[in-house]
Amino acid sequence: MIQMAQATTGSESRRDSSNVVVETRNLSKVYRDFWGRSKKTALKPLDLDVRRGEIFGLLGPNGAGKTTTLKLLLGLIFPTSGEALVFGRAATDVSKNERIGYLPEESYLYKFLDAEETLDFYGRLFGLDPDERRRRAAALIEMVGLTRDRKRQLREYSKGMTRRIGVAQALINDPELVILDEPTSGLDPIGTREMKDLIIDLKSRGKTVIMCSHLLADVEDVCDRIAVLHQGELKELGRVEDLLRVTGVTQIQATGLSPAAAAEVKAVLERHGAGDIDIGNPRTTLEDLFLEVVRDTDCLLYTSPSPRDQRG
C-alpha cells in the first residue's frame, strides 16, 4: 500500500443546510463578575457545523471551551454573542431537547435507584408508556453491559458503571443527536474500547454524535471530523485523516517482505533521491497490545484484527 500525502487546510466548505444538524456562527461566551465586567472568556467567536450521521469530536485540553460549547448547544447557558442552531432551531428553544440525548461530564443520578428504576424514571420524563419504558430499558441495559448489575443501587456502582448507565439514560428517548461529554472518563481500557464501539454503533443506527474529550486516542479512533479548541479558540477543523496526514512523506507498507527485498526497495528509493528512509516493522499501540493480551486469556472477545498480527 502506498499513501501519498496531500496538502490540506483545516477549513471545509459548507454542505447543504438540510444535512446540518448543528450550526454555530460567531458564537462566544464571556463570564462576567458581579459588576458586569469581563472575568473570563470561555469561548471566542466560533463557526462550525455538525453534519447528519457523523461522529464529530470536540478536542482540547481542560479549560479549552469544550464543555462551554456543549452547554451553549443545549441551551443550558446563554451566549454573549453569535448564535447556535440545532435542528434549525435556536439552541435556547427547549423543545429541541426531546430529540437530543446528553451525557454530562459528571452524571448526577439518583443513587438509591437501580438501573431499571433509573431508566424508567427518565422514560417517564419523556412521556413513554410503561411497556415502551420496559422494552427500551432492557435493551439499553444490555447494550451498555449492565445486565448482571441491573438490580443493584447506583450507589454501589463504580465510576465506570455509572458512566455506562449515564449513556443508557442519554439514549432512553431514542434521540437523533447524542452529545457525550468525556464518555470514557473513569473507564478501564476494556470499558473504553467497549464505549468507543458503542459510539460507532450509534452512528450505524443513524445517530449524529458530538463527542467531547481531551484524550487523543478516543477522538482519533471514532470521529469522522474534529474541531480542536485551545483557550476558547478554534484552532483546527476538518476530517481526522486530513488533519493527521503528513505532507511530503510517502508511506509504503507491505507484508512478507524479506530483508533482501527490503534492502532492494531501499536502494531503489535512494537512487531516486529519497531522504530519511525508514524500512521496518510498524508499531502497534499500547491499547491494542493490552486488548490482545486480555483477548488471549479469554477475558475479552475482540474480533477485529490487531496491527500486531501484521508484523513481519
Tell where the protein language model's regions lie, with residue ranges.
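A short, flexible loop at the N-terminus of ABC-type nucleotide-binding domains that lies
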Residues: 14-21, 30-45, 52
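Conserved ABC ATPase "signature" region
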Residues: 27, 120, 124, 131-149
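Conserved ABC transporter NBD signature motif
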Residues: 82-98
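Catalytic Walker B motif of ABC-type/P-loop ATPase nucleotide-binding domains
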Residues: 178-182
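ABC ATPase "signature
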Residues: 237-238
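Conserved small/polar residues in nucleotide/adenosyl-binding loops
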Residues: 302-307
